Amino acid sequence: MHKHQHQNIHLNRPIHVAILTVSDTRDYDSDKGGQLIQSLINQHENHVDINHYRIVKDDIEAITHQLKLWLTSSNQLDVIITTGGTGISQRDVTIEAVRPLLTKELEGFGELFRYLSYTEDVGTRALLTRAIAGTCDSTLIFALPGSTGAIKLAIEKLIKPELSHLVFELNKDIRN
């Protein structure tokens, strides 16, 4: 496939998404990050169904439990996006919960995200993020920081432009 063909991929079905906010302080009314992800991802050119939206505490067992529930559900998810818990404080454990579940890590996501964060958003504070992405079988997982600026950057510049292509690639041998 040539570059221009990747940009024209349109799936003949909705993209099924789950959003997980990781925070000790947010609830559904105050969770600006989770709400922003919903808003931005719904603007994707392909139809998107937000199948699940949850908030869990900054606790590795709680995060892992919720992710495993979604990953083993009979309703196949295409994408899980987490927000929060990607920094360097003792309570930031999202990466420790996500990484062991990944079949393949998309190293380029974290590299590009930190580069764009450095050049377009927070400068050298980009060093503090450990945002990652990868796959767990045929599900994409993105672990994003909790700040709305970081969420907007990741969704607009990295996730939305490649979402249909990523979902297509993960499912072409399974569903076609």
UniProtKB/Swiss-Prot annotation:
SUPFAM superfamilies: Molybdenum cofactor biosynthesis proteins. Keywords: Molybdenum cofactor biosynthesis. InterPro entries: MoaB (IPR012245), MoaB/Mog-like_dom_sf (IPR036425), MoaB/Mog_dom (IPR001453), MoCF_biosynth_CS (IPR008284). Pathway: Cofactor biosynthesis; molybdopterin biosynthesis. GO terms for biological process: Mo-molybdopterin cofactor biosynthetic process. GO terms for cellular component: cytosol. The keyword ATP-binding does not apply. SMART domains: MoCF_biosynth. Gene3D superfamilies: MoaB/Mog-like domain. CDD domains: MogA_MoaB. May be involved in the biosynthesis of molybdopterin. Belongs to the MoaB/Mog family. PANTHER family: MOLYBDENUM COFACTOR BIOSYNTHESIS PROTEIN B. This is Molybdenum cofactor biosynthesis protein B.
